[in-house]
């Protein structure tokens, strides 16, 4: 038994705590209408150096985009240019709450903008809010301490600094980043795959763009 940490082209990479195994899924998953997802706890068998996923254990929650299951924290990232959009914040927090996931709001680059208005609005609504700077490191340690265990999803549009903050937390180059283009008003980095990045022995992170976040019925099949 292990956790699916990566899904790519029909292959599932399962971490059992000692090693990562490349596996295929059995055909009976298609008949049941259930597909293994990143974050799933799965049973698998090894034969001749390759693995087969034999069962997916019950999920506490899941999202269809990004395709990930068993999420503990849902972190939405925003920064000052363009200004935070209340509709997007509300949409993302609503998706998280509906699926039984705790939403956390993060405003990046606190040295370059004033987020007090949004902080007061969403803290008053009962949400946890953090203001950090990927450039100076301000607030990063406090945010890092929130990742106490389980799987966390980080979402936000390109250029908000998700990758830079991950690099600050990991202490190395976890993801490639690009400087924000002032002319285009957007960043050049785009997350291209669904994969969990290990933060500690108990905590893993998935980074995704806000525009691709979507939810499904909590009891629906995936």
Give, region by region, the residue ranges found by the protein language model.
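Structural detector for short beta-strands of small beta-barrel domains
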Residues: 1-8
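Short, glycine-rich nucleotide/cofactor-binding loops
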Residues: 78-85
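SH3/SH3-like beta-barrel fold
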Residues: 12-16, 23, 44
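Conserved catalytic-core segment of NTP-binding enzymes
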Residues: 89-91
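Helix-rich effector regions associated with P-loop NTPase G domains
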Residues: 10, 27, 33-50, 57-74, ...
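Short, structured beta-strand/loop micro-motifs enriched in basic residues and often containing a Trp
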Residues: 19-29
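Canonical P-loop GTPase G-domain recognition
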Residues: 109-160
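Walker A/P-loop
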Residues: 158, 163-164, 168
């Amino acid at each position: 038994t292990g956790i699916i940490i990566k899904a790519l082209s029909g292959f599932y990479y399962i971490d059992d705590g000692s090693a990562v195994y490349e596996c295929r899924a059995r055909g009976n998953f298609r008949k049941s209408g259930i597909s293994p997802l990143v974050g799933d706890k799965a049973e698998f068998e090894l034969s001749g150096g390759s693995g087969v996923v034999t069962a997916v254990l019950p999920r506490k929650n899941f999202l269809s985009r990004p395709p990930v299951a068993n999420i503990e924290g849902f972190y939405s990232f925003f920064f000052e240019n363009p200004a935070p959009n209340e509709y997007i914040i509300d949409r993302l927090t609503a998706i998280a709450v509906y699926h039984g996931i705790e939403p956390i709001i993060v405003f990046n680059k606190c040295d370059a903008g004033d987020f007090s208005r949004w902080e007061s609005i969403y803290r008053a609504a009962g949400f946890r809010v953090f203001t950090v700077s990927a450039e100076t490191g301000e607030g990063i340690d406090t945010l890092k301490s929130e990742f106490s265990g389980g799987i966390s999803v980080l979402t936000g549009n390109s250029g908000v600094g998700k990758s830079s903050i991950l690099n600050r937390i990991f202490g190395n180059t976890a993801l490639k980043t690009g400087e924000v283009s002032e002319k285009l008003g957007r960043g050049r980095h785009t997350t291209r795959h669904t994969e969990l990045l290990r933060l500690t022995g108990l905590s893993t992170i998935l980074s995704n763009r806000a525009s691709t976040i979507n939810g499904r019925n909590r009891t629906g099949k995936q």
